[in-house]
């Protein structure tokens, strides 16, 4: 790699088999080849990201086996005929026909928590359908396949829906919070299944976590996942630009992050589930109301904590379309030692928060803009040696903006999250009724094909680096540190193995370039030379790159792009990199300066990048 650069990110974020894909911009043979960075996180679907469309993307899983092979289901007084015309223009639908009263088809499984059972159905001899899950109170819902409305429901269902998908087909959904052992589909009559004959068409059944039916996932003998998968790198588009998001392990302590009614309700607030479109694009935001005032109406989560602990609460609140003068809010109540109660109100029109009582140490983080929603986050640190925390989300916390007063108020919310730590991390969905943990994001070390000795240029563009130790490291062959990049005391810094070499006035975010040329080293940050006086070169060479964090570190890394050149770019190019990012003319001039590349190498880069299109995250 003596005459090549290595790039990770930029406009070419890609993944292959769960690993990040960087690419070498011309090796000594003139070829452009992928370089894989091994990525790990964990074995569940607790992580999320903001996708390129601006919506929160989750991991999804169809828990029903043989989701459209109904001959592999068990029938009770029914027959199933394949090869029928489907809702999607295929011949993948089935005719489900009953031969006795209450005939049905079912699939055995083991499921718990908030789940949505859905299927595509169409009337035939029967003009109604029935979905039922067996467990608890046996939740069920009837659906009128002629008029497209939900009929009778029962058994503790949370919500139900029927969606017209055209051609007489509907997608029907049953939403519940029950431990179940099977899922059933019935041909039915008007709010009954007692008819001794009848038939409907069925296709593409799905059982998944959450309050909405998402895009169908085909399964066979095993469950299948989609969306943001286990151990998949998270390319996060918060702010519109793709960044590699690396976060520490965090646990969401809220029992239900979207099913607000599943949490403890104090004072009887009115909760309406599936009320509005949420930041993930589904109809799974809730509405909370106080229609009477007089007493506080709130959602509560209470649990034991360590003395003098720090917790961060975050919630998405739909933006108001006009100014507000009555406020919802959040309350932290630490008890068991010297009790400390803090109240924070939020303004969903302006995207601001105000502490109207602060007995614990509070940090009100800047509201994050999620299109139609604000994400409000508050950190509270106990200083009274308390061992119990009660966290409250209020329908109305203040009618005057200065003191806690109950009143009439409603607002729309989504994504309740309470995590131990001093800052909010990305949303962790929880439908379990307990806590759920997102595991640590880690990229293992990447070894270059050959080490870089002598002159080099390192370009890094990050949205954020929060670290107590180096978050991006460049090491020699023997593993000793050559250069480590991180943020320290609100400014960028680089450690050369023996000293810090960046001036303390350097910004903590943005673009940074390290240029090593002979015995000289320079640091450019956001267009300005920020080299500390007396900075020295580390001549160990670069053989490995590590973009990682340990479970002991409270790091967030949001890496937009990283480029490694095995030559020293000019000062003007370095300055331009930290203002404009990697531009084609810089890459072109670099390639032109490398006289060992074969003719046509630049064209091969274009071809290689085109071939990456199917891998782009």
Per-region residue spans from a language model:
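Flexible glycan-contacting loops in extracellular carbohydrate-active proteins
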Residues: 180-192, 196-199, 388-411, 532-559
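Short, aromatic/His-centered strand-loop micro-motif at the edge of beta-sheets
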Residues: 103-107, 139-143, 152-165, 296-302, ...
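Short carbohydrate-recognition loop motifs
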Residues: 83-103, 244, 275-297
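Extended recognition patches within non-cytosolic domains
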Residues: 2-3, 207-238, 403, 418-449, ...
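Localized edge beta-strand/strand-to-loop motifs within extracellular or lumenal beta-rich domains
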Residues: 123, 175-178, 319-321, 379-384, ...
């Amino acid at each position: 790699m003596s005459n090549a650069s290595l790039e990770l990110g930029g406009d070419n974020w890609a993944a292959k088999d769960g690993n990040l894909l960087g690419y070498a911009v011309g090796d000594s043979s003139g070829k452009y080849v992928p370089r894989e960075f091994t990525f790990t996180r964990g074995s569940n679907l607790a992580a999320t990201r903001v996708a390129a469309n601006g919506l929160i993307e989750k991991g999804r899983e169809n828990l029903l086996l043989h989701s459209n092979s109904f001959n592999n289901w068990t029938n009770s007084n029914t027959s199933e005929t394949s090869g029928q015309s489907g809702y999607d223009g295929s011949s993948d639908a089935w005719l489900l026909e009953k031969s006795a009263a209450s005939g049905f088809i079912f699939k055995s499984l083991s499921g718990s928590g908030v789940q949505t059972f859905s299927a595509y159905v169409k009337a035939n001899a029967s003009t109604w359908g029935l979905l039922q899950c067996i467990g608890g109170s046996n939740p069920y819902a009837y659906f009128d396949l002629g008029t497209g409305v939900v009929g009778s429901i029962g058994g503790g269902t949370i919500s139900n829906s029927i969606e017209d998908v055209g051609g007489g087909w509907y997608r029907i959904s049953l939403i519940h919070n029950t431990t179940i052992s099977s899922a059933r589909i019935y041909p039915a009559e008007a709010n009954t299944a007692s008819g001794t004959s009848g038939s409907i068409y069925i296709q593409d059944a799905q059982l998944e976590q959450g309050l909405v039916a998402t895009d169908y996932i085909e399964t066979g003998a095993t469950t299948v996942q989609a969306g943001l998968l286990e151990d998949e790198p998270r390319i996060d588009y918060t702010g519109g630009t793709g960044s590699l998001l690396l976060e520490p392990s965090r646990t969401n302590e809220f029992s239900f992050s979207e099913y607000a009614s599943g949490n403890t309700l104090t004072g009887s607030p009115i909760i309406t589930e599936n009320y509005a479109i949420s930041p993930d694009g589904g109809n799974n935001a809730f509405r909370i109301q106080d229609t009477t005032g007089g007493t506080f109406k709130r959602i509560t989560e209470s649990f034991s904590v360590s003395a003098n602990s720090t917790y961060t609460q975050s919630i998405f609140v739909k933006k108001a379309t006009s100014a507000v003068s009555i406020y919802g809010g959040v309350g932290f109540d630490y008890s068991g030692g010297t009790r400390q109660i803090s109240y924070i109100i939020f303004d969903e029109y302006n995207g601001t928060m105000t502490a109207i009582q602060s007995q614990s140490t509070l940090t009100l983080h800047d509201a994050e803009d999620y299109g139609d929603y604000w994400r409000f986050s508050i950190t509270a640190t106990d200083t009274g040696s308390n061992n119990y925390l009660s966290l409250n989300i209020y329908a109305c916390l203040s009618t005057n903006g200065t003191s806690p007063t109950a009143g009439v108020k409603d607002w729309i919310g989504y994504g309740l999250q309470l995590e131990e730590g001093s800052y909010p991390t990305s949303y962790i969905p929880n439908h379990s009724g307990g806590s759920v943990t997102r595991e640590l994001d880690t990229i293992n070390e990447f070894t270059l094909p050959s080490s870089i000795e002598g002159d080099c240029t390192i370009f890094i563009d990050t949205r954020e680096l929060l670290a107590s130790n180096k978050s991006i490291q460049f090491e020699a062959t023997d593993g000793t540190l050559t250069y480590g990049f991180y943020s320290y005391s609100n400014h960028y810094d680089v450690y050369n193995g023996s000293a810090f070499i960046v001036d303390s006035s350097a910004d903590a975010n943005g673009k940074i370039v390290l240029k090593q040329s002979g015995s000289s080293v320079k640091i450019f940050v956001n267009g300005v030379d920020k080299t500390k006086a007396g900075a020295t070169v580390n001549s160990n060479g670069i053989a490995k790159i590590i973009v990682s964090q340990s479970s002991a570190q409270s790091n967030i890394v949001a890496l937009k792009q990283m480029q490694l050149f095995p030559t020293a770019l000019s000062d003007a190019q370095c300055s331009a990199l930290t203002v404009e990012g990697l531009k084609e003319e810089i890459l072109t001039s670099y390639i032109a300066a490398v006289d060992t590349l074969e003719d046509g190498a630049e064209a091969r880069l274009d071809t290689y990048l085109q071939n990456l299109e199917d891998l782009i995250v």
